[in-house]
Amino acid sequence: MIVDDIYKNNDKKILIKRNMRSRGILSMRSSIMNFNLNKKIGIIAEFKRRSPSGFVNNENTDIFKYYDVIHNSIAGMSILTEERYFNGNQMDVVSVQRYNIPILIKDFVSNDEMIESSYMIGGDVILLIADFLERDKIEMLNRKIKSLGMEALIEFHDLKAFERITTDENVIIGYNRRNLKTLKIEDESFDAQDLIRSTGLLSVLESGITSENILKMPRYNAMLIGSSILSNDSVLKSAGMIKYDGFGYS
């Protein structure tokens, strides 16, 4: 399995260990809440070159031009840094710091060294995936994240994995519609929404969101969208038409 292989080889990753951070930490939570207060959903736009699910970025390969097109519509950016399967590059994060927008490090983080490196390249939020990490491990990793003043996006797909999520004040909870074990979209976003709502934390819906289905999605504070935006789908325009009132979309 691809994701298992990535985790198994994390100790072999070549990480940037020189401090290349050029600004303070920016809060993704605050950025999303500001959008919500203005009756908008927060959009986290993803930059990636390819993914094992079959996506190849042929349209928006220049991350600077990509940002110029989307920056007025987004609450933050998600940048893939995993190299082997996603062609990610840590230097993308270093470069995007100049825009003063919250940056989510999209990788399969499993140790303190990866968190420290993510901080040094300019990341603000660390992704932790509950489907592949035990609760004790998540708690340990988030202690490190908090010690650096960063936030954590803790995502799950399997509803049973939800109980592994720590509900600390620096946490955002994400529901990934994609099963990372099969790479298929298996949507239980309405049930997941109820679980997340019980924590009182901000929620993010992830994967397979397009201009055709975004209006049918349940209420989340934010949506993480990659392939559709990168493929020049009109999903950002559709998202801008949605009124977020704190209880649902209209």
From Swiss-Prot:
It comes from the Archaea. Keywords: Amino-acid biosynthesis, Aromatic amino acid biosynthesis, Decarboxylase, Lyase, Tryptophan biosynthesis. Transmembrane segments: none annotated. It is an enzyme of class 4 (lyase). Pathway: Amino-acid biosynthesis; L-tryptophan biosynthesis; L-tryptophan from chorismate: step 4/5. NCBIfam families: PRK00278.2-1. Belongs to the TrpC family. This is Indole-3-glycerol phosphate synthase. It comes from Picrophilus torridus (strain ATCC 700027 / DSM 9790 / JCM 10055 / NBRC 100828 / KAW 2/3).
